[in-house]
Amino acid sequence: MARVMDPAGAAATDDRAIHKVPDPFPLTLAGMLAALGPQAINFGISIGGGEAYLLPNVSARGTLHMHWLMTISVVLETALVYECIKYSVCTGRSFFAATNDLKPFGFWPWFWAVVSIMTFAWPAWMGGAVIAAHRFTGIGNPPVLGLPPHYIWAVVALLAVLVVFYFSDRTYNFLSKFFTFIMFANIVLVLAVTIIAAKPHHYWQVLLGYLGITFALEGYPAALPKTDALALFNQPGGSLMWVSFWVIAAGFGMGKYAGQVTGVLKPPENITAQELRWNTADPGERRKMEQWVKLGGYSLILWWAIIGGLVMTYLYSVCGLAYLHEDFLKTGQIPSGVQVPIQMATIAQGVLGPMAGWLMLLIIMVTLYDAQFPIYDTFIGRTTCDAIAVSGRARRPYRFYYFVVVTAAVAAGFYLITVAQPFILWIGVAISALVYRSIGAWQILLLNNRRLPDGFKVSKLNSWLLWITVVTGFGGVGTWAVTVLPGEIAKRFGG
């Protein structure tokens, strides 16, 4: 019988069942398309707030000097997410459940549950979506109780989240199909608008920003708020460690045996929060697992890092520069308040006419709103339920706690949607995510080197990238907290 290390580090007899490693998809374009689901969701989370709120806003000022931060961010986040994918493919267990094995034992899953709720329960993405829905339809609620005219759309949107989750066959199946459609629709429309709107010098100017050449020649731009620059370092703002849930749900590697959340009309499945075992000594099994890991990594690099993280953020920046910058030079004004979420629709309408503006409003509405599904399902629901599961105190099926948590989070959204403008909320989420990325990088480095078999541990290159992630994330947010945050607080509260 095999022997493993228990969470406390003592040798223990491993009597878990040994599972066969499923046959992986081929490492071809067809295989990449078959493996698209997790990265389509990751893409949808990434191409949303930053692209609708931040990038056109920064480009409108012409302050592209710090776009090189996004290039570095894509590299660092790719290394982190790849290691999280590797762990979950090899174990069938999420990153968040795995942190239960890190000292202090039992603390970290609850840490992640609490900070996820505190950070992502604020409907920063949906706030922009409902503004777009109000503009798109012209339908709003009367100004009663001080509620904004788009509040009725928040009610519809939040109720739709619950309906989808309660009555889906499997929640992941809905997310995967929905986000795949949105991903390709977003790519086609933004590409069309960019080709028509932009001139060659716009492409070149943005490229110089991404490569850091503009910053090297001109230094830091005075017109760019330092908070926005820090938010750029979180772009394209992917799903970080939460991608581990989706590769499990997609059935990658040991994920095939892990169980999924089902709707209320289906019987609950047994969802494990423990590592699943496979024969690591069998060369054939190792080859299959290695291909699953490669598939997860290649899919991440193609769909999220290259297409989402580099190409799409580049196109959104070119659009903002090509259309909004000219108005900024004339008026000195940039979109603010409720105008921020719809600024890309403003670009489309100015370039292609009213019909395109309406279509872009629809795309903005959907691409911002779609983020709320995985935020409630995965960032809040699954993270919290994994904390409950690994505690050993669950007395009901995993799905019961999932629906309690998700329903409570959605109910809170009816109030939280009224608290602040979505761009302000999104900036707060972006800065918090830098801290979470740093903690996650440190934890996955420990987990993969301790828990995975030889040949699957963290490479030297990724070890360096993960440590750079830790240092730059904490360093950037710490510097901002000391030098910028006090002034922002004083400005906000008149101090």
Predicted regions mapped to residue ranges:
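Membrane-interface "cap" regions at the ends of multi-pass membrane proteins
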Residues: M1-Y53, Y257, V264-L276, K288-Q291, ...
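Hydrophobic transmembrane alpha-helices that form the core helical bundles
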Residues: F107-V144, A154-V155, L368-D386, F474
